[in-house]
Amino acid sequence: MRVKYKEWEDVRSFTSFNAGGTADNIRLFAPEYKFKYSGAFLYAVAHTFPGIDHERRMTMSNIYRDVTLEHVTEADIDKELRIAGWVENIRDHGGVSFIDLRDMYAVMQVVIRDSSLLKGIRKEQAVSIKGIVEKRDEETYNPKIPTGTIELEAHEIDILGEVYKNLPFEIQTSKEVREDVRLKYRYLDLRNQKVKDNIIFRSKVISFLRQKMTEMGFLEIQTPILCASSPEGARDYIVPSRKFKGKFYALPQAPQQYKQLLMVSGFDKYFQIAPCFRDEDARADRSPGEFYQLDFEMSFATQEEVFAVGEEVLTAAFEKFAPEGYEVTKAPYPIISYKQAMLEFGTDKPDLRNPLRIMDVTEFFQKCTFKPFIGRTVRAIRVHADMSKGFHEKLLKFATGIGMGGLGYLEVLEDGSYKGPIDKFIPDELKEEFRTLTGSGVGDTIFFMADKEERAAYYAGMIRTELGEKLDLIEKNAYRFCYVNDFPMFEKDPDTKKIGFTHNPFSMPQGGLEALENKDPLDILAYQYDIVCNGVELSSGAVRNHDMQIMVKAFEIAGYDEEVLKEKFGALYNAFQYGAPPHAGMAPGVDRMIMLLRGEDNIREVIAYPMNGNAEDLMCGAPSTVTEQQLREVHIKVRD
């Protein structure tokens, strides 16, 4: 903004004659001065005189409004004000009409006694309204809005933004509209205050995270968006190079290599709110294409020190932003090994709000005569609850729906005996052993899942969740955190039978080089860890492999020779020749964090411009075709 020379003369005049910044400078903001002086001049005067309230002066220096709606109060009664916003609703009460005017901050009722003012006024127009602030009749107070005791009697309405088309949906009920329509008209959907509040909330959480990390001594450093493609992880989004024919950049799936290189560079603590790009399918808790992480890394740090940082920042954020009355797990968080998680919860993302636990009864049933259990992994869940025949039928339907052949169970009767289809296959002499093994007592029901180990764990986890939800056992109003650690370093592809990395290839194997050289790869654990909250994976992290000799061996086991390591991860390979420090970190997901805090079931509700489930931007039309000229410039020809 530029301030005209004549206006600077006026600023000097006001400064000379009214250094206290009282009456005259405030008089400048009267409506007649709005058109005499530019916004730049008014802004300059406001900041020359600190006596003007900061909140109001920032909204007073333009011709469209004197103040935003949340700042109109009973102190303004009988004053003339100009306000601006969108026409949310128009109501005709016979002789007098009302407009509900909405801006980003609040809604205010406007009284129209001159019907000619409403000529050409439509819902969702952007308007500026001038009038007198009045006290509402007490019986018309609206305690649901900040301006509920006042209204503006209009004597001038200016249309600032016309509505040329019929609205595709009602703004106030946009969340009830089909998702594809909402996403196509996202700029209208975001006018819905509930939708907008999610984005405002997101901004506040991110600001808090930045502040917290800075207070903890971390430096915010941005890493490149255009980088080299790497063979691990999900599919890359690739970007063709114009200057280098046949070569491509990739959008980063995470700032993994760059943040490790920062540690090699001598930085001690790094963080950023990092955009990450992965060409993978959508889920309720995973947005396709792009997502954001609170990415951080620490030099000369152990796993326990990273745990402490993760606990401090997440506990602080959740305690600050959780809905009123919610409990948040205090540090230190429970630590559950991957093996324990798969056994007791049937998943590596355990929901600790569910009190049910899974038991392994495989060995016991090898002594019984029930053929479907012999030679299989058998899991059991004990539940103390009254369950009707109808409940059992619905649970069986659920079980078959997820692929189970059936769902065995036993009920413990008043006399301590068992009732159920499996009872006759348990010899009497083994029933006391079974009672001790399962901890079962009168009123309990024990459900059984049997299959190969991985499938049995999956089925047990699904049944545990279904039981917890349908029996209303899930703890309410709580955020329950835990760490899951000791993940397997390697896994075998069931189809190719080849050994590959289970998760992050840059993790340090437990036992170091000795383990890599002497142990079965499938028995080697990694210093990898997740943070899980209410069954949602919030973060992954690891102690990094900073020893080149260990890294070469780890990649060799996963099928990559040293030349591939040099080619695909050349920067790390070379940097680690020059004294790489031990380092570790993690990256909590910002989108998932906000989804949990807002109680949303779909992650797209907390993203300003999300793609749909097919990774399409319905509003802007991405992905889109490009011209032949654009393709030629990057040396690409599209095949049919």
Stretches with model-predicted labels:
Residues S13, G21-A23, Y43-A46:
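Short, low-complexity S/T/E/D/G/P-rich linear segments that nucleate or cap local secondary structure
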Residues S13-F14, F29-E32:
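N-terminal basic, low-structured, amphipathic or hydrophobic segments
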Residues A23, R27-A30, G39-F41:
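Gram-positive cell-envelope targeting signals
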